[in-house]
């Protein structure tokens, strides 16, 4: 999950959570498919390197049944740069550091940009509807936040981009400076999470602090919003809100903060993204709702936003489409 806490003066104001985290970039959220464009494009080169360096034990782990699932393979690939056997062999980190490899890959970078943009966009919508002050600092914790560095390791650049998202959503200038914490060299996001647990006294989160934003009508889930209450109009309006987001991300934001100039996104991948973001949104939404209903009762209150269900599907399809375009060159 991605868990977001809105805090002011060391006090938690609001909390929201949704199942849209780094694993969403490396798996098909709606099937058991073992295909993922990002992983399939890169894993062969890394396997060849393991063979070349005669790292048989790591080669066996690579080929294990556990790593057939692409999100598991992604976790394994990310771990290699810190592996003691890799370090002992003196392998150049540039060739084995999966995070670094993805940073240098301009073809798939649009996927990571959309991932980040969608989360900040959602946060900005909550800030707007709750009348909160836009954040002075945004801090990332947890291993999944390392994915942010794939977009850029320059926190100032990312802060400028993030401020523009807020300004466009809020329709007004940003009231302060914005610092992105957690991108500096040597920062361990998982360690930050642990330290926070030790330093901060535990207090029970009140129900009225937990919010679930409904992007289709710019309101928040109430006790009346149950899974059984979701009708076709609700779904259609949600799809429209997703279409609005993709137009915002791929057109509005790219026009004011050129993705190629700032992040190194290729024009071809941007073109593919604009095509894929229009496909099967309702199907992805319905599959996401159905999966969530398997974990809930029909009369249960909706526990997470539907906003990210179609985005998950699009990002997976986009990874496949970019992979196909590269293999067909």
How should each PLM-predicted stretch be described?
Residues 11, 129-131, 161-164, 204:
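Secondary-structure transition/capping motifs at alpha-helix termini
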Residues 147-176:
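Conserved helicase motor "Helicase C" RecA-like lobe of SF1/SF2 P-loop NTPases
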Residues 175-329:
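Acidic, glycine/GT-rich loop-and beta-edge segments that sit at the periphery of enzyme/chaperone cores
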Residues 29, 70, 135, 173-175, ...:
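Proline-rich intrinsically disordered, low-complexity coils
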Residues 3-153, 215, 219-244, 261-282:
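Phosphate-binding glycine-rich/basic clefts of nucleotide- and phosphate-handling proteins
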């Amino acid at each position: 999950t991605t868990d977001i806490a809105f805090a002011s003066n060391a006090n938690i104001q609001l909390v929201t959570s949704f199942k849209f985290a780094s694993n969403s970039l490396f798996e098909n959220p709606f099937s058991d498919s073992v295909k993922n464009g990002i992983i399939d494009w890169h894993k062969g080169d890394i396997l060849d390197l393991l063979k070349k360096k005669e790292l048989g034990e790591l080669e066996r782990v690579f080929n294990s049944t556990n790593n057939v699932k692409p999100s598991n393979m992604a976790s394994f690939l990310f771990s290699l740069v810190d592996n003691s056997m890799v370090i002992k062999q003196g392998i150049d980190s540039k060739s084995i550091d999966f995070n670094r490899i993805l940073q240098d890959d301009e073809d798939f970078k649009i996927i990571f940009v959309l991932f980040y943009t969608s989360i900040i966009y959602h946060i900005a919508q909550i800030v707007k509807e709750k009348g909160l002050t836009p954040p002075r600092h945004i801090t990332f914790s947890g291993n999944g936040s390392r994915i942010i560095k794939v977009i850029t390791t320059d926190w100032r650049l990312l802060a400028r981009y993030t401020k523009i998202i807020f300004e466009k959503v809020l329709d007004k200038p940003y009231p302060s400076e914005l610092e992105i914490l957690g991108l500096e060299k040597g920062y361990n996001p998982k360690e930050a999470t642990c330290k926070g647990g030790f330093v901060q006294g535990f207090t029970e989160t009140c129900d009225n602090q937990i919010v679930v934003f409904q992007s289709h009508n710019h309101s928040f889930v109430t006790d009346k919003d149950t899974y059984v209450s979701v009708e076709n109009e609700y779904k259609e309006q949600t799809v429209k809100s997703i279409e609005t987001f993709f137009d915002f991300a791929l057109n509005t934001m790219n026009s004011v903060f050129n993705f190629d100039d700032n992040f190194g996104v290729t024009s071809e991948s941007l073109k593919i993204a604009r095509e894929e973001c229009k496909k099967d949104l309702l199907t992805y939404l319905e599959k996401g709702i159905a999966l969530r209903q398997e974990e809930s009762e029909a009369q249960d209150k909706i526990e997470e936003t539907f906003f990210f269900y179609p985005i998950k599907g699009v990002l997976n399809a986009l990874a496949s489409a970019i992979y196909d375009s590269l293999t067909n060159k």
